[in-house]
Amino acid sequence: MPQFPWKDNDAELSPLEAFLAEWDDPEAEEEDFRNDFFRGSEGRRKKAAVMLMAIWTVVITLHYWVWGSWLVWALTGALSLQALRLMKATPEEAPPLLTGDASTVPYPQVCLMVAAKNEEAVIGKIVQQLCSLDYPGDRHEVWIVDDNSTDRTPAILDQLRQQYPQLKVVRRGAGASGGKSGALNEVLAQTQGDIVGVFDADANVPKDLLRRVVPYFASPTFGALQVRKAIANEAVNFWTRGQGAEMALDAYFQQQRIVTGGIGELRGNGQFVARQALDAVGGWNEQTITDDLDLTIRLHLHQWKVGILVNPPVEEEGVTTAIALWHQRNRWAEGGYQRYLDYWRWICTQPMGWKKKLDLFSFLLMQYLLPTAAVPDLLMALWQRRFPLLTPLSYLAIGFSCWGMYYGLKRLTPSEGESPWQQMPALLARTIGGTIYMFHWLIIMPAVTARMAFRPKRLKWVKTVHGAATEDALELKQS
C-alpha cells in the first residue's frame, strides 16, 4: 500500500537526514498543516465558506457569461455518459457461502463490536443475535462498549455476560471523548479479530451473516464490506417507506459504482473491516461526525477495495417523524460533505485511479454541490426572468435517481410468479413515493452547507425510541 504524509517514515531516514530533519522536519510541518487545515471545526468552517462563495460565484458568472448555458449542457452530457456506464454495468456476484466444519475449513477470527448508550430497549436482542450466529463460537467474539449509559443497559449486560462466554463488556466513564469513534478505538487494541464488524444496537442480524461476509476477505486487497441496510419498520408511515426506498437506491448505486471501478462506501451499521486495513489507516477518526464515511475515504486513499453484500440485509429502525428525519439527515449531510473538505488535497494527488476520482467528482457534484447551487441559480433565474440555468443537470440528477430507485427496488422485490409487467405498477408507485420523499435533500443540503460556512456546529442527535424496552427488560430479569 502507498505511503501517505500522515504515516510514520522515520525509520527510513539516514543519520544525516535525521539530523537535518531536526531543523526542518517536513513531517512536523505536515502534522501542523493537518491539524490547522484538514482537521478541526475552525478549519472546516473556513473551507466550507470558501466553497460556498465559490459555488455562488460560479453560478452567477454562468448566468452572465454568453457561453454559460453551453457549458452546463456540456457538463450534463459528460455526466450522462458516466450515468450510462453505471446503468449498463452488471453487478458483481457474491462469493459462495462459507461451509464446512471448523476442523477442516480455516475460519478467520471475527470481532463484532457495538457501541451502546442508553439502549436498554434493544441491547438484549442484539447481544443474543451476535452471540448466536452460525459461526464457530471460538472463532468470533462480541464486544459491547457501554458509553456511560444511565438507564438499565449496564445491568442487562451484566446478566448477558453470564450467559455468553464470548461476550466482553467495556464501560466508559463520563469524561470519555470521541463519541462512537472513541468508543470503538478504545477497545480495538484489546480485540483479536482478523475481521472487525460494527453494528448499531438496534440492528437485526441474520444468523448466517458471517458465513456470507468472510469469503469476501479472501482477497489480500479487500479492505471492507458494507452489508445492505433495510428498514425494519418500513410499513409504519410515509417517512419509513421513503427510507426503505432510499436504502434500495443506495444499494443499487453501490453495486453499480463498485463494478465500474468507483467508490464503495461504508454505512456504519453492518460494516466489516479487515484488521490490516483498519490498522493501516489509523482506526476510526474521532474528529468526525460520520465515522463510516470518513473511514471510506481513507481506505480508498490507501487503495483498499470496499464492497457490498446485498443479501441478506441488516435491518435497523427508521425514524418515524419529519423532525427526527431532519436531524438525522443533517448529520449525514454534514459528515458526507465534510470528508471532501478534509481530504480534497489527497483525493486530488494520491494514486486512486481515474475511475475512482471520476466517480467521486460525479457524486460530489450531483449529490452535494448541485442542491447548493440551485439556490443562487433560482434567484438569478427570477431576477433575469428565465429558466434556471442548471435545469439540465437537475433533470439528469432526478432522472438517474428515479432509474436507480426503480431498479434497486426491482432487484430486492421477489417476483412470486409475477412477470416484470405485472410488477411494474407497484414498483412505479414505490418509486414515485420514494422520489417525492427524496426531495427533502434539496432543502437539507443547502441548509447544511450554509450553516457549516457561517455558524458553529449545532447538530442535535434525536434518539430513536424503541417500543420493546419493557418487554426486553422483563425477559432478561426473569432469565
From Swiss-Prot:
It is an enzyme of class 2 (transferase). It comes from the Bacteria. GO terms for cellular component: plasma membrane. It is found in: Membrane. Changing residue 331 to A: Significantly reduces the monoglucosyldiacylglycerol synthase activity and blocks temperature-dependent activation. Its cofactor is Mg(2+). InterPro entries: Glycosyltr_2/OpgH_subfam, Nucleotide-diphossugar_trans. The keyword Transmembrane helix applies. Keywords: Carbohydrate metabolism, Glycerol metabolism, Glycosyltransferase, Lipid biosynthesis, Lipid metabolism, Magnesium, Membrane, Transferase, Transmembrane, Transmembrane helix. GO terms for biological process: glycerol metabolic process; membrane lipid biosynthetic process. Its EC number is 2.4.1.336. Changing residue 329 to Q: Significantly reduces the monoglucosyldiacylglycerol synthase activity and blocks temperature-dependent activation. Glucosyltransferase involved in the biosynthesis of the non-bilayer-forming membrane lipid beta-monoglucosyldiacylglycerol which contributes to regulate the properties and stability of the membrane. Catalyzes the transfer of a glucosyl residue from UDP-Glc to diacylglycerol (DAG) acceptor to form the corresponding beta-glucosyl-DAG (1,2-diacyl-3-O-(beta-D-glucopyranosyl)-sn-glycerol). It can only use UDP-Glc as sugar donor. Two types of DAG (dipalmitoyl-DAG (DPDAG) and 1-oleoyl-2-palmitoyl-DAG (OPDAG)) can be used as sugar acceptors, but OPDAG is preferred. Belongs to the glycosyltransferase 2 family. This is Beta-monoglucosyldiacylglycerol synthase.
